[in-house]
């Protein structure tokens, strides 16, 4: 049988197996002929011939017809088996244990397909997955093109992973190998070069924008990026960098050199509308920010020829010079910078203008308040320097929310007790710290006995007295008892807050004006009239702060804070000695990190005062000595702490969030105080444009919903 074919037939199934002799052993060759055969029977026949265990998915059904006229070895026979299944929409997925699984091709992409590489790329129609890294081309751009070349309807798929810039391709090994060859051909660096062109007259930003705009076309007529040169401006050196292929870069460089030409010297006027800065303030900076440069004097173009002005000079950053000012009889020093204006300038004209000298040429800068714009009359060749300075100054300044916490607790106890004696013929024991001297009481009593009035001496004696007083006046003897016990507590918790621009001082005042008697005068006439002079002093909370935002979100705060109040127990405005004020001030500068709380001042104070007045010898007698003594005792404790927390606000969203947070805090506190019910602001209505009316709660809910992330 060696060298001859043996043909064996199973009804409608024909299969020929031929064994050939070789020096090393036996090799099997196969030829197949199937007509109208059930596909599962075909799979079982191949499984038996290849000695492989095959699992068939229940969805694999149908009949096949195929015929092979050539003899095939085992590898070719297996590839023939895979090709037949592929034609009918099925695929073979090898398992780790050597078992083959036959499933539908559209389900195979989610199975455990072997991972191929350059050493083992796979053969023929077997399913493989390949990971291909890209070095020069973006995977997201190449993936859609490769999908059109793959069997997307079957097991083929092409996806990209952007963070690693790789392609993940699944499909038949032969197809994937062809796609990998295409990727290797496309993923190559172009022969690009970079050329730096220094400009002498034109602005680098303007030239780069012009050249790039010329390269822009609509999508239909867009040229490939490899045929275009990319131009980037370097404002620091006033040069442009051209990047492109060898055949495109020279054209761009030639265009740039043609644009970099000296302009004809002629005057021109340009209006620059400012976005954030104030026009009048910016004129002062342009004319008065002293830097290196010559400062010359010249006469103004005003109708008054006798008036004079001094001018400023602006030099390029790569030039240096020194000079002195003249014309006004004064001189000043200048500091260096990349671009500068002399510190001397003339008086403002009716439109708030200045005339300065830049690179030896006069430039007139005027402000228009109504539109917040600058009107600049200048030679065209120096306008670029002016615009750069203006653009750097006209920026949105961040804001700072400064929140303060003032916590103060005061506790004071006092005791005043004393007995005074007097005799018209022998003298008296008088203690003035009791509030009512006994001599004043005796004068008032004598006056009452003589004319029956209590409007002078008694009124004066009792006007400033607190507590209880009792006594007698009989014959030559009189006695007066005074007693007073006081207990005062004062708790202050204030949380003032204020928002201000960076480097802008802000003031916050909350309080009341207290009248203070400063003088009194009696006029003589038909009746005695008393004329009082009164001044008003503001008491309450004062906060003055100037924040400066530094690098790293730190804030330098210059603080002036004052907390004042009228002292308890001595607050009557008609007191003979006036009103007593409690004042606490803090004036310092601190460096605080954004959103951090820092204590800027504190006081822990405890005071105890005890005063004993007595009559010598008599005041020391046990029991009876109390009749000849007066005792005053005062104890006070005070705890005061001041805290600050700055919050940097850089955009409107942060400002809106801070506003909502403040409102919610106020609303919650109000509801806690009232126990129940809505906030007072909830019922207030806001009339917006278009005639619509909303409550404050509706507006707050709309704002919160706008900033709520999607999907919640």
Curated annotation (Swiss-Prot):
Region spans: Disordered:
288-342
Where, per UniProt, does this protein localize?
Cell outer membrane
Chain segments carrying region N3 = 267-394
Tell me the domain of life.
Bacteria
Major subcellular location class: membrane
Q: Which GO terms describe its cellular component?
A: cell outer membrane; type II protein secretion system complex
Q: Where is this site: May serve as a pivot that allows opening of the central gate for substrate egress?
A: 511
Fill in the domain comment: The N0, N1, N2 and N3 domains are periplasmic, while the secretin and S domains form a channel that is partially inserted in the outer membrane. The N1, N2 and N3 domains each form a periplasmic ring. The secretin domain forms a double beta-barrel structure; the outer barrel has a diameter of about 110 Angstroms while the inner barrel forms the central gate with a small pore in the closed state.
Kindly provide the name given to this protein in its UniProt entry.
Answer: Secretin OutD
Q: Which organism is it from?
A: Dickeya chrysanthemi (Pectobacterium chrysanthemi)
Q: Which gene encodes it?
A: outD
